[in-house]
C-alpha cells in the first residue's frame, strides 16, 4: 500500500521528538519514528486552515482509506470526520482508532475520553493478571495496546476493502483499544463467565510447571499442559517417582504444590546452560525455549534464517535493524523497505502526482505555511 502520513508543518509527528535518538553529522533522528514509519510518505499539511482543508478533501476523493487516532470529536470539529468525507467519496474506508469506541449506538459513557496504551491494558483486565499475587498489577510490554490495536485495525480495513469489492460502498471502521485488548484477554472473560471466579494474577490453578525457571546462564521458559508432558519431564529429570505422586499427578495438584516442585526443577536445570537444557528437553518431547535478551534475539540463528530483522538504510544516519512485519507470504516473502521520511519529504510529490497541482500553486501553498516541503 502507498501510505501518506499527514503531519503538522514545522512540528511533525510527536514521535520525532521522543528518544532514543541517532545522530550523525549534525543530523538527529528519533529511533521510534524511524522504526514505526518505514515505507510511509510524509505530507506536511496544516488541516486547520481553509486551504489545508481543501487539500485534504481533494486527497480523500483520490484515496481508498483514511486512518486517524486523534481524540474523539477533534476532526469532526474541523469538518473532516467520516460523515463529512463519505459524501466526497462514497467508497471511502474510514478507520478511527480511539480508547473506547465511536460507532453510533455503541459509544458508552467513556467514548469521548482520551486514553493511552496502559489505560486500555488496565480497563480490559489484562493488568490485573500480569505480575504476581503479592505484587501490584503490572503491564505487559511498552506499547502492547497500541501495537495490537494497530494490527486489529489493519485486519478490519482489509475486511472493509473486501466488502467494498462486493458492494461498491465504503464504511466506518471503529477500532477501540479497550475492545481490542479485551479480545486479547478472552481467556479471562471465559473463566469468569463459566466459573464466576476471578483468575489469579501470575499463576493458573490447573497448570504447572508454567513460567521461567533458572538455568546456569539465564532462564528457560516452560509450559507443561498435561500429564503426558509432565511424565516426559519427570523421566528426563530422572524423577519418575513424581509422575504418580499425589502432589503432582495432575495439573491442579501441581499448581497447588508449585513451591514443592519449583526447587526440584531448578535443581535439575542449575548446572545446565539454557542451550543444553533446551536441547535435552525438546528432544524428549518437552517444548521449552530460552528466555532471550535483546542481544540473544539479534544473534539468534532462527531469527536470522527468518530474516525477522530487516536492515533499514537511512541516508543521513546509517543502517539499523528493525523487526519486519509478523507474517510472510509465499508470493512476496521479502518486501522492499524504505527509511522513515523526513518531515514534508513527499509534500511536493503527493500534491503534484496525485492532485496534479501546478508548481506555482504548490509554491504558494508552501509560502503561506499551508504545507511544508523538505528543502
Locate the predicted segments by residue.
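Oxidoreductase and adenylate-handling cofactor-binding alpha/beta cores
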Residues: 128-131, 150-170, 183, 187-193, ...
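Short, well-structured beta-strand/strand-turn elements
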Residues: 3, 282-296, 357-363
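Aromatic-enriched alpha-helical interface/lid elements that frame and gate functional surfaces
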Residues: 208-284, 288
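Short Gly/Pro-enriched turn/cap motifs at secondary-structure boundaries
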Residues: 24, 33, 200-205, 210-212, ...
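Terminal low-complexity tails and localization/encapsulation signals of metabolic enzymes
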Residues: 214-215, 296-375
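N-terminal helix-loop segment corresponding to the beta1-alpha1 unit
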Residues: 1-166, 342, 348-375
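Glycine-rich beta-alpha junction loops
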Residues: 10, 99-101, 177-182, 217, ...
Amino acid at each position: 500500500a502507498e501510505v501518506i502520513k499527514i503531519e503538522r508543518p514545522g512540528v511533525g509527528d510527536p514521535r520525532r521528538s521522543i528518544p532514543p535518538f541517532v545522530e550523525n553529522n549534525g543530523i538527529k533522528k528519533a529511533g521510534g519514528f524511524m522504526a514505526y514509519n518505514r515505507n510511509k510518505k510524509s505530507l506536511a499539511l496544516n488541516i486547520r486552515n481553509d486551504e489545508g482543508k481543501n487539500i485534504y478533501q481533494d486527497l480523500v476523493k483520490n484515496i481508498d482509506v483514511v486512518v486517524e487516532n486523534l481524540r474523539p470529536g477533534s476532526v469532526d470539529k474541523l469538518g473532516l470526520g467520516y460523515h463529512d468525507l463519505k459524501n466526497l467519496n462514497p467508497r471511502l474506508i474510514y478507520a478511527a482508532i480511539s480508547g473506547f469506541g465511536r460507532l453510533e449506538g455503541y459509544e458508552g459513557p467513556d467514548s469521548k475520553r482520551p486514553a493511552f496504551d496502559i489505560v486500555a491494558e488496565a480497563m480490559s483486565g489484562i493488568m490485573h493478571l500480569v505480575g504476581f499475587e503479592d505484587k501490584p498489577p503490572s503491564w505487559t510490554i511498552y506499547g502492547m495496546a497500541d501495537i495490537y490495536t494497530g494490527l486489529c485495525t489493519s485486519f478490519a480495513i482489509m475486511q472493509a476493502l473486501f466488502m467494498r469489492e462486493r458492494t461498491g460502498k465504503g464504511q466506518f471502521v471503529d477500532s477501540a483499544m479497550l475492545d481490542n485488548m479485551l479480545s486479547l484477554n478472552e481467556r479471562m472473560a471465559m473463566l469468569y463467565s463459566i466459573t464466576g471466579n476471578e483468575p489469579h494474577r501470575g499463576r493458573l490453578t490447573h497448570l504447572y510447571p508454567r513460567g521461567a525457571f533458572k538455568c546456569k546462564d539465564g532462564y528457560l521458559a516452560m509450559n507443561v499442559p498435561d500429564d503426558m508432558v509432565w511424565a516426559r519431564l519427570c523421566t528426563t529429570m530422572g524423577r519418575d517417582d513424581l509422575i504418580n505422586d499425589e502432589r503432582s499427578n495432575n495439573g491442579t495438584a501441581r499448581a497447588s504444590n508449585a513451591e514443592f516442585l519449583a526447587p526440584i526443577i531448578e535443581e535439575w536445570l542449575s548446572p545446565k546452560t539454557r542451550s543444553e537444557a533446551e536441547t535435552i528437553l525438546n528432544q524428549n518431547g518437552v517444548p521449552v525455549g530460552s528466555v532471550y535478551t535483546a542481544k540473544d534475539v539479534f544473534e539468534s540463528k532462527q531469527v536470522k534464517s527468518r530474516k525477522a530483522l530487516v536492515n533499514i538504510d537511512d541516508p543521513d544516519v546509517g543502517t539499523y535493524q528493525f523487526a519486519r512485519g509478523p507474517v510472510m507470504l509465499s508470493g512476496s516473502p521479502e518486501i522492499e523497505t524504505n527509511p522513515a521520511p523526513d518531515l514534508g519529504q513527499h509534500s511536493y510529490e503527493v500534491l503534484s502526482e496525485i492532485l496534479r497541482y501546478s508548481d506555482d500553486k504548490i509554491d504558494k501553498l508552501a509560502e503561506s505555511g499551508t504545507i511544508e516541503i523538505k528543502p
